[in-house]
Amino acid sequence: VNNSFSVLSYNMMYCDVHKFLWDKKSINTTGIANTLDTLSADIKCFQELYNSDEFPELQILKKVSRRNPYYVYMHSNVGNDQGQGAIGLAIFSRYKIINKDEVYWPPNNNGMLAADIVINQDTIRVINVQLKSMGIRVNKILNEKKEIDKEETKNVLLKLKEGFEVRGIQVNMLENWIDEIRDVTFIIISH
């Protein structure tokens, strides 16, 4: 009996939705969305997924399942108890998802998403995690073509300090989740 399975993790960077909404012609949005269902994996974990039924280019849930049916679990949005939110983390599985759990860290749609998935006779827990971004935009700093002054250095160091503190709390929450897992093999997918 073959118990192997494949896992894919991909940060979608919101499919460049801001540019798409601005000009409706974003090559990034269309390219990412059209490529998703061609990426072969039994379990697909996405971070920063953006789904919208308003625009065909952003119907990501449909696009990923177009060629292969998947069980889908996505971060819930406020007022949406079905787990099929519009933005955040998502787990797609060719195998049945029998249990789900999530922790949401606003305001940036980060958090942890867990799915218990039955593969043959075994159950595994897949945990899709996205920790707080450090908020440092290196390209912005480099593109300004100026010497990084003391003020900019101070700002970068403050962002790093805040990011490490928040990430420490988030990692502790992840450790608590792991400590609660009993009799189930688990894998952690993180961006």
Language model features by range: what are they?
Residues 2-6:
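N-terminal secretory/membrane-targeting segments
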Residues 7-12, 32-58, 115, 126-130, ...:
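Active-site beta-strand/loop signature of hydrolases that rely on acidic residues for catalysis
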Residues 9-29, 51, 135-164:
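Acidic/histidine-rich helix-loop elements
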Residues 1, 33, 37, 43-141:
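Structured beta-strand-rich core segments of catalytic domains in phosphoester-bond hydrolases
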Residues 70-91, 155-183:
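Active site of divalent-metal-dependent phosphoester/diester hydrolases
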